[in-house]
Amino acid sequence: YTVRARYLVGADGARSKVMEDLGLPLEGQLARAATAYVFFRADLSRYTAHRPSSLYWIVTSSAAFGEIGMGVLRAIEPWNRWIAGWGLDMSKGEPDLSADEVTRRVRLLVGDPSLEIEIDTTSIWYVNQAHAPVYSKGRVFCGGDAVHRHPPSSGLGSNTCLGDAFNLAWKLAFVIKGHAGEQLLDSYSLERAPVGAQVVARANQSRLDYGPLNKCFRDPSAADPVASGLAQLSDPGAEGAARRAALADALDLKQFEFNAEGVELN
């Protein structure tokens, strides 16, 4: 069938066909890093019910690869439905996401070698650091994840998409109703593209800010860097005190991700 319209809005996500067909460029890098995710069911109440959270970061040698360098458990339905994730080395090609390997990985993250899990789905998620410098061409306008592609760090995605939608919607309404000329629509890219670029930079910086945390949890000179680094955090001497002070500073840096109010309000 055919639909005729005066304007078209492409808000079709990070794999936008509208962006592709329109030929709008992206600046930055797509798929600069990768994470394996598994959606699974298991009763973890004995490990989590007394310390409830939505996210659990797990420091272990089995999940020490990548910028974050930690495994993650995300509670979907406490305390039986979960998403587990760990960094991937993209240079090694497609990862092994067989049931046996995924079960082994989840058990290592949880720390329970006999944990029974039911795997629902597995997937690979890629970290993007890219934005469109221009959001429109002619009578076609793009917005949302189509024009700013970034990780969820700092929780900036939904707010930014809503900001795009609000900015474009009232302008389209004014033009269509005859309250303003079409020149008003030129301001959409001018106002929103800088916000998209800023959000992409901030979200990716929030991932990079895990670097100082990783250093606190690791001793590069040891056979097991993570085990040795964690042990040194409890050292009663000067070295342990210095490592704990560095950890406090590294945790404070994460305020920009979890508690800051700023760029997400643009």
Predicted regions: what they are:
Residues 88-92, 156, 206:
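Conserved short loop/turn motifs at secondary-structure junctions
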Residues 10, 119, 125-205:
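Conserved mid-domain beta->alpha element of the FAD-binding
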Residues 92-96, 158, 178, 237:
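Hydrophobic alpha-helical scaffolding
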Residues 104, 108, 174-266:
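Helical substrate-recognition/capping region of FAD-dependent monooxygenase/halogenase enzymes
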Residues 3, 114, 138:
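Structured loop/turn residues at beta-strand edges in well-structured enzyme cores
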